[in-house]
Curated annotation (Swiss-Prot):
UniProt signal peptide: 1-24
Function of the protein: Alpha-toxins act on postsynaptic membranes, they bind to the nicotinic acetylcholine receptors (nAChR) and thus inhibit them. This toxin shows inhibition against mouse alpha-1-beta-1-delta-epsilon (CHRNA1-CHRNB1-CHRND-CHRNE) (IC(50)=1215 nM), rat alpha-3-beta-4/CHRNA3-CHRNB4 (IC(50)=5.173 uM), rat alpha-7/CHRNA7 (IC(50)=4.786 uM), human alpha-7/CHRNA7 (IC(50)=8.869 uM), and rat alpha-9-alpha-10/CHRNA9-CHRNA10 (IC(50)=202 nM). Also competes with alpha-bungarotoxin for binding to orthosteric sites on muscle-type T.carlifornicus (IC(50)=256 nM) and human alpha-7/CHRNA7 nAChRs (IC(50)=19.81 uM).
Principal place of residence: secreted
Disulfide bonds: C26-C41, C33-C46, C40-C61
Subcellular location: Secreted; Nematocyst
Record-given protein name: Alpha-actitoxin-Ms11a-3
Keywords: Acetylcholine receptor inhibiting toxin, Amidation, Disulfide bond, Knottin, Nematocyst, Neurotoxin, Postsynaptic neurotoxin, Secreted, Signal, Toxin
Further details from the record: Negative results: does not show activity on rat alpha-2-beta-2/CHRNA2-CHRNB2, rat alpha-2-beta-4/CHRNA2-CHRNB4, rat alpha-3-beta-2/CHRNA3-CHRNB2, rat alpha-4-beta-2/CHRNA4-CHRNB2, rat alpha-4-beta-4/CHRNA4-CHRNB4 and rat alpha-6/alpha-3-beta-4 (CHRNA6/CHRNA3-CHRNB4). Does not show activity on rat TRPV1, human TRPV3, rat TRPA1 channels, the human ghrelin receptor, human neurotensin receptor 1, rat ASIC1a and ASIC3 channels.
GO molecular function: acetylcholine receptor inhibitor activity; toxin activity
Gene Ontology CC annotation, any one: nematocyst
Domains: entry comment: The presence of a 'disulfide through disulfide knot' structurally defines this protein as a knottin.
Modified residues (Lysine amide): K66
Length: 67
């Protein structure tokens, strides 16, 4: 019985570490995204960072610019 509970808990922890955005329903600030604006949370847009490691390859949810 204890081994089943441990297994379920381990699977949940792995899934929550691998797919944190899927549990939240939308992707939060600085989460990786796939160029679709609607997958990021309200007020965020998906764009390529122009700095840092992997720039131009990995897209992230960032704050929408005002103006």
């Amino acid at each position: 019985m204890a081994s089943k509970i441990f297994f379920v808990l381990a699977v949940f922890l792995v899934m929550s570490a691998v797919l944190p955005e899927s549990f939240a329903g939308c992707k939060k600030l600085n989460s990786y995204c796939t160029r679709q604006h609607r997958e990021c949370c309200h007020g965020l847009v998906c764009r390529r960072p122009d700095y840092g490691i992997g720039r131009g390859i990995l897209w992230k949810c960032t704050r929408a610019r005002k103006g």
